[in-house]
Amino acid sequence: YLFYPKPVLNVGLIRGTTVDTHGNLTFEEESINSEALSLAMAVKQCGGIVIAQAKYKAAAGTIHPRTVHVPGIFIDYVVINEDIHTHQQNEASAYNPAMAGNIKADLAEFPKLPLTEAKVIARRAAMELKKGTSINLGIGIPQNIASVVNEEKCGKYVTLTSESGTVGGVAITGKAFGNCWNPECFLDEDVQFTWYCGGGLGAAFLGLAETDERGNVNVSKFGPRFNG
């Protein structure tokens, strides 16, 4: 087995949508939960400080407790940022309510992928999907499987998930990958991985940099360039 020494965390940086004057943080316009709650708890247990960025400020007692994702006891400092350019929902969108689960996008209007080698691979992979299973899609060509599932209208038979915590809906390709259209649920990222590690997936389609004839996979070293 591998032993990982406990890291000492001094500062945690998290963000949400609304924070009240007691520091309670909500995520109603966010497209993922990430690991904000676990990160804040870990930093506080190490005696560090947690700084939360939010878009809106509310008076204490005006936020419904069910919508609070990170309680104020885990937050030390708050930064209110109303600039959409530095508080984007994700890399591709300042704010899209369909990614946050606040409306349902009309998936029938989404353009189909052009017939390329990548789509052929995605279509072949989609043939391996089994009814009633949960699926994890990785970055790269695997993300096109979501478009194929939507195009073939078979999303009701499988549940697509992402490592960032989305459950259901249709995974988004491109710069907003990790988010999805019309999600059914948002899990914290660490909770999602608990489900994965426990064997909850029916299949996983993952991206890679290179592989060999024995199935060994390289996902981190891309020639002379550092990943990140």
How would you label these PLM feature ranges?
Residues 201, 210-228:
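Gly/Pro-rich active-site capping loops and adjacent beta-alpha segments
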Residues 1-152, 157-161, 166, 182-186, ...:
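Metallocofactor- and cofactor-centric catalytic cores in central/energy metabolism, strongly enriched
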Residues 1, 163-211:
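Ligand-binding beta-strand-loop-alpha-helix segment within the catalytic cores
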